[in-house]
Amino acid sequence: MHEIITLQLGQRANYLATHFWNLQESYFTYNEGEESPIDHDVHFRAGVGADGSETYTPRTLIYDLKGAFGTLRKQNALYELSTDSEYGQGLWDGKEVIQKQTPIIPSEYQLNLEQGLPAPALSSETVRYWSDYNRVFYHPRSIIQLNDYELNSKIMPFEDWDVGEDLFNDLDKEHDLLDRDVRPFAEECDQLRAFQLFAGSDDAWGGFAAKYLDRIRDEYGKKAVWVWAMEGGSKLQRRNQLKRDINKARSIHAMAPQSSLYVPIKDPPGHVPSTINLDAQSEWQTSALISSALETVTLPTRLRPYHDFETSLAGEDGMHKIFELQSTILPEDKTPTGAAGGNEASTEATSKVKTEFDMDFTYDDPQNRNSHIFNQVQITRGYSPVTDEASIREDLGLSRKKRFYNSEPMLESFYTPLAFPTLDSFPHNLFPVKESNAKINILASLTASSRTAGKLRAMEVVARRVVGVDERENLVNGLGEIRESYETGWMSDSDFDDD
């Protein structure tokens, strides 16, 4: 097995990760002899419930602030035996004063799931927390509430990058978070493959995630680390926007060099086609849309047979770690050419680097015509492909070397007939499908291109103007060093002037 441990850091990250886990749960098969194309052991772990029954829960750690978990409890139906609600007083014979918070009323969706009834349609109004549309049981060790800060607090907002750093340092000093939280899951793994981090990057969660990543690298230096860096896509007042921009700059400076993959994700995305019916004010809806692309591009990491996804990301030089997330919803009646059959990987000559997508979740412009692409990983799902037998027989390593020596972009394509399921936990009219619970075909991509250089240069300008003198030189120089690997030999000074 090649297991992955997931860390979910913050409210925005948990909205997205909840969709991710719901999708993984939907791939389970329950008929004898029916095998899922997904290897569930990659993300799920076997255990024993409170009543001795076998359990299968996500290998994940969910961090969020006080008040952010909604009705999700640390103990659930798998791990909680019924107990008498009347607690004894022990040796205390004095008067008791019991204080209780007003309980959060479970959503109708959750109540119906618990009772085995058909799930009602969700809406932006009925989803109050990410747990309102959660369909998965978690191990009690997965639920970690940080009580030092409260969700949406005006008195102590969890916004500054330094605040997240300080909180991690304090908690790690007191508890040793890796030893308490990560190690129990890691020691269960036969062959730990990677860590996957869903994390906010433009608020205090960026600082928290950066320090966590430092500790992971110290302890598990050779393991891959994939960072999905969530950032707000809506415009703010100038002062708040500058704070957000500096937080993003500090996050990418601290985490990108230590990551195997670092993907900035705008929530909501800057451009959405008219065929997508999106309420951009609803995190439930925007994260559902993002999950359709993210869950698709990560499919090769859990498909049978095993795929060396890390090699695909590294390209030929291993220099480029910042990727763009893009996707296109494909029409049902269109069949791609040059795609490999089965759950296959290919770099055949008929595969083309794609520069135009319906949705770009990293940058505002979905068009990529004028930039140089260094590496691209494409994942197509849901089609019956036209198979080019000669190209499949060609050695993939040889194909990559040909592209490298011809100064062509590194390109690897994956195909799976497993279409994307639109679950009842999704907005029912988000995608252009004729009926609810339909499946859709998606082309998603991770692309490393010279566009990243322009974004990093813009961060340098802001950092040089806003950041204090003690940190300014280190941050600006660090961003510059990262930028150089995305522009050398491909971008001129005039290109930057155009930006």
Curated annotation (Swiss-Prot):
Entry keywords, A to Z: Mitochondrion
GO BP annotations listed: mitochondrion organization
Subcellular location, record wording: Mitochondrion
Pfam annotation, one family: Tubulin_3
Family annotation (SUPFAM superfamilies): Tubulin nucleotide-binding domain-like (SSF52490)
Record's GO cellular component terms: mitochondrion
Similarity comment: family membership: Belongs to the misato family.
Role this protein plays: Involved in the partitioning of the mitochondrial organelle and mitochondrial DNA (mtDNA) inheritance.
Protein name in UniProt: Protein dml1
Name of the gene encoding the protein in the UniProt record: dml1
